[in-house]
Amino acid sequence: MLSYRKLAMCVLGRPLHTGGGIDSPRPASQRAAALVLTAAMLTTLAAPAFADIWHIENGDITISAGESGNNVTQNNNTTYGDTNTIITNQNKDTASSHTVTIEAKDKDDKVEVTLKDVNIDASSRSEAAVSVTGSGNTTIKLDGDNALKSDIYSSGISSSGSLTISGGENDSLTAQGGSGADGIYSSGSLTISGGTVTANGGSSGGGDGGDGIWSSGGVTISGGSTVTANGGDGKDDYG
């Protein structure tokens, strides 16, 4: 661990030597400069990538693209610069009715969020369990088993822009659309890269059922993914 003294000596060198074997301190201006530079260097050395775990039971979560990471808001409190946003349930066996909104407003915006053993049932909320808005690029990384269920006419995941869902061989996602809604809906492009993804369209509810997966920008499946799409009440598996 570097000390202020060692860093200051690196910046200015050792004290001045005068006759008689007595060291003369550096001028005050140089000592002040050393302290400023040392503090700046220590701040840089001690600044790790910031990450936080967000429990969905504590309230709705909104994630937006920021200059140095994600800006995450929950219960009207915003954390800036989160570079590894992880959303989870405190008890994955009990579904939460709170929802996740991801905002990648501009086409150059990039947002990455990890869902870790998330269990959301928003069937009482009149909205999607996970909504992705804007024209930017969003990546949802899967960690563990994740389940999303939405209300009538709301998809399990509803997305605009470019959406990528990624995971490993032991990671999974089940997205259940509400009545008349798709399991996964994207008005942009959709890429599924790795993991096991099951998308179920909702039942008709007196009208048309929902597709398992519907994307106006096309669907790309890669990375050893296992994808199952089930349309509801005679609807297409893929729309």
Language model: regions and residue ranges:
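N-terminal secretory signal peptides that target proteins for export/translocation
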Residues: M1-P27
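A composition-driven surface/loop motif
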Residues: L2, L7-V11, R31-G239
